Regions:
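N-terminal regions immediately upstream of nucleotidyltransferase
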Residues: 1-49, 156-223, 421, 442-454, ...
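Eukaryotic intrinsically disordered, low-complexity regulatory regions enriched in Ser/Thr/Pro
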Residues: 204-207, 362, 366-370, 376-448
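Phosphate-handling catalytic interfaces
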Residues: 149-173, 331-354
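Conserved catalytic core of two-metal-ion nucleotidyltransferases
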Residues: 107-148, 280-327
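Short, conserved charged micro-motifs
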Residues: 99-106, 272-279
Length: 498
């Protein structure tokens, strides 16, 4: 309990300890100081011009903003997360040509009279940061053309600027909440924003006839593949995982939605081992016609995967995660089974919406997302069993800042002979338009060398100039002496005659 003598109004709540009160005061001070710093930037007479150049560039190029700036744009005024009067806008946007766009935008600022401009690679490969007069103006992130086109198509247009749609924003936040090995200090802020988007943009699918196009797997094949995945500690996130969540669905008649399993979807860091185990177990059942197709990752949205077909029917997808996703371990028929958390499943299902492939039924995916959210909201924060949400463990690699720096260092050694190439700049761009212009001018300056004359026959053997001058002087003196002697002789001669 806080001492009664404490006068600070932040400490009037009975449940606050003295330490809690200290932290509340500290947080308020941090917020106030940040506000003062932001106001200094916003009062800069050049800042409005800087911002106008940026927003016009985004409009003209039809780039797609994401992150906090997009969340703020799609929320109503009463719930916006940024204030236009006290917060510096933080523009993060996608581009299918991020490197060239970063340079082009830097050049525009330079032509408009700004001198201190720097476009440089971020820690994350494919992201470029732009600074103008030492103010961070933008983060430009590369997005492969097919995904970028899909984001453009689904984007929300506000005042001529494109922002990622609410489903993408939910996906990105669920992805961060599923990464229990990442920066969990951001979770509170991320979860608050997630709830705001969910409040104004809930899943509205009615889930009618979601199984109309489902062709269930034969029972023996389904059981064999499921057990092989359990044996290899895979994490379930498809229909089998949904069947575990469906036990908590209200009303009860909705629980049969996931009884016909279309296919098994799992996460594994060793997909090849699972594939071999599945083949082995199916062969033991006398099933031979097995085909495996490999699908490359789609940007950083959907990881590389393997599609398993039996008798030309798809039975399973095995995804190899490129980041850590949390899951719960539950007991099913005396077996420990790994089931992806709600956030892990949401991050994948919502990402599938942007792939535009026939195996991903948009309406069914939206229905499953709605059911997951409803289950969680109806659980009264049970937070046990499969309903645990913010938990370890997680499956997949977790790349720390140190890991990324090590990777960049090894890339620098690999690419040091390719400086100036696009491949090099993707990792190590450091572009300053003013310095670049100086380099270009210097490279075109003609170096004038002293003119060397080819010696001619008449001058090739001449005495050096200094010696010739000295010799001439001596000749004049000698000539003068001869004249004096001649005159003296004349005088003496005439004298004798007189």
């Amino acid at each position: 309990m806080v001492n009664e003598n404490v006068k600070n109004k932040l400490c009037v709540k009975d449940h606050l300890t003295f330490e809690d009160c200290e932290m509340a005061i500290l947080r308020l001070a941090i917020k106030e100081n940040a506000k003062v710093d932001a106001e200094k930037v916003l009062k800069n007479p050049n800042f409005n011009k800087m911002l106008s150049i940026l927003t016009n560039f985004i409009r003209r190029k039809k780039l797609v903003c994401y992150g906090g700036i997009a969340i703020n744009a799609v929320l109503p005024d009463e719930d916006k997360i940024y204030s236009t009067e006290t917060d510096i806008p933080d523009y993060d946007f996608f581009s299918s040509n991020a490197l060239d766009d970063a340079k082009e935008l830097a050049d525009i600022y330079y032509k408009e009279g700004f001198q201190n401009i720097e476009a440089k690679s971020g820690v994350h490969v494919g992201t470029f940061k732009l600074f103008v007069d030492y103010v961070a103006m933008a983060d430009i992130s590369y997005m492969p053309v097919p995904l970028f086109n899909m984001l453009q198509k689904q984007a929300v247009n506000v005042d001529g600027i494109l922002y990622t749609d609410p489903n993408y924003l939910k996906m990105a936040m669920a992805l961060e909440l599923s990464n229990s090995a990442g920066d969990v200090t951001r979770w509170e802020k991320v979860f608050k924003r997630y709830k705001l988007i969910e409040k104004y943009y809930p899943f509205k699918t009615k889930c009618n006839d979601v199984n109309r196009n489902i062709h269930p797997i034969a029972d023996n094949i389904y059981e064999t593949i499921k057990n092989a995945c359990i044996d290899k500690n895979a994490v379930f996130l498809g229909d089998y995982a949904m069947s575990q969540y469906s036990q908590y669905i209200q009303p009860h008649n909705l629980r049969n939605y996931f009884k016909p399993v279309a296919d098994i979807d799992v996460l594994s860091e060793e997909p090849e081992e699972i594939i071999e185990r599945i083949k082995e177990m199916l062969n033991n059942e006398g099933i031979q016609n097995i085909k495996v197709l490999k699908h490359d990752a789609l940007g950083e949205l959907v990881p590389m995967s393997y599609q398993i077909l039996v008798n030309n029917d798809t039975c399973a997808y095995i995804y190899k995660p490129f980041r850590c996703h949390n899951y719960n371990v539950i007991d099913v028929n005396h077996q420990h089974v790994n089931i992806a958390t709600i956030d892990t499943i949401l991050s994948f299902y919502l990402a599938f919406l942007y792939i535009n492939k026939p195996q991903y039924d948009t309406e069914r995916l939206m229905c499953m997302c709605k059911i997951l959210v409803d289950v969680y909201n109806q659980s009264n924060l049970a937070n046990n069993g499969v309903l645990k949400r913010f938990e370890l463990p997680c499956i997949g690699p977790q790349h720390t800042l140190s890991d990324m720096k090590k990777e960049k260092n090894s890339k620098f050694i690999e690419l040091k002979g390719k400086k100036g190439t696009k491949e090099y700049d993707m990792y190590f761009l450091n572009y300053n338009p003013g310095q670049q212009q100086e380099k270009e001018i210097n490279s075109h300056v003609v170096q004038i060398k002293p003119r060397t004359r080819t010696p001619s026959r008449s001058t090739s053997n001449k005495t050096p100039f200094s010696k010739r001058v000295l010799r001439t002087k001596r000749r004049r003196v000698a000539s003068r002496n001869k004249t004096y002697k001649h005159k003296a002789r004349k005088l003496s001669f005439f004298g004798k005659r007189l």
